[in-house]
């Protein structure tokens, strides 16, 4: 059985060694990190290199690292005990293509398409969140004969309520704890 752990590091540089140690103690075959920075990536790679054969981050795919500022400074990293090949065929139509790290991992049983994503939060990036989710959906809707794993931080839903289920960011939870669709969302109707 293949064991995978996905973890948002919350771009905390000082806590990286402790977070990574906690994950390594669980001995996963594949690790998928989100909110990795250029600086933290080199630290993570150094720590994991003794136990993981293949390690890649989304920054390696950029033609220029000059875009790694502001909300685009955060990326993803995949580490595995198996051989991997970066999937350079980017089938995702989205504003920030580096928000999906796609690799093919060759396990003893199979080659798996493995996707690690970090969806930008809508509160600070407006429509980029929706466009990224749509691009991810459309890209994965393309048929593949290989097994696939998708993991990451999707920055959704807002909440999961026992009585009402999933509550999206397009809803407001009233004082009685009941979710209602917002009439105006971020000073707009939500229509495009």
Task: Give short role names for the model-derived ranges.
Residues 16-17, 97:
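Structural motif corresponding to alpha-helix initiation and N-cap regions
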Residues 36-120:
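Structured beta-strand-rich core segments of catalytic domains in phosphoester-bond hydrolases
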Residues 95, 102-104, 127-141:
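Internal catalytic-core helix/loop-beta-alpha segment
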Residues 4-13, 123-125:
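Acidic/histidine-rich helix-loop elements
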Residues 51, 131-192:
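Metal-dependent phosphoesterases centered on the DNase I-like endonuclease/exonuclease/phosphatase
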Residues 88-92, 117-133, 169:
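Surface-exposed cleft-lining segments at the edges of enzyme active sites
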Residues 18, 44-45, 73, 127, ...:
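Short aromatic-enriched loop/helix-cap "lid" or pocket-rim segments at secondary-structure transitions
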Residues 3-9, 22-44, 103, 114, ...:
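Active-site beta-strand/loop signature of hydrolases that rely on acidic residues for catalysis
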């Amino acid at each position: 059985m293949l064991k995978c752990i996905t973890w948002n590091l919350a771009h905390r540089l000082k806590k990286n060694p402790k977070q990574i140690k906690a994950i390594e103690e669980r001995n996963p075959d594949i690790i998928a990190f989100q909110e990795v920075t250029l600086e933290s990536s080199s630290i993570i790679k150094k720590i994991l290199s003794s136990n993981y054969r293949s390690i890649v981050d989304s920054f390696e795919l950029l033609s220029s690292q000059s875009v790694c500022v502001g909300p685009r400074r955060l990326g993803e990293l995949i580490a595995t005990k198996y051989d991997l090949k970066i999937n350079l065929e980017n089938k995702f139509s989205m504003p920030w293509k580096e928000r999906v790290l796609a690799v093919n991992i060759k396990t003893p049983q199979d080659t798996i398409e493995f996707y690690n994503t970090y969806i930008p939060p809508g509160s600070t990036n407006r429509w980029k969140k929706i466009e990224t989710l749509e691009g991810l959906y459309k890209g994965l809707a393309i048929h593949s004969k290989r097994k696939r794993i998708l993991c990451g931080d999707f920055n959704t839903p807002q909440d999961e309520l026992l009585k009402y289920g999933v509550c999206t960011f397009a809803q407001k939870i009233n004082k009685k704890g009941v979710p209602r669709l917002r009439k105006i969302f971020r000073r707009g109707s939500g229509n495009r």
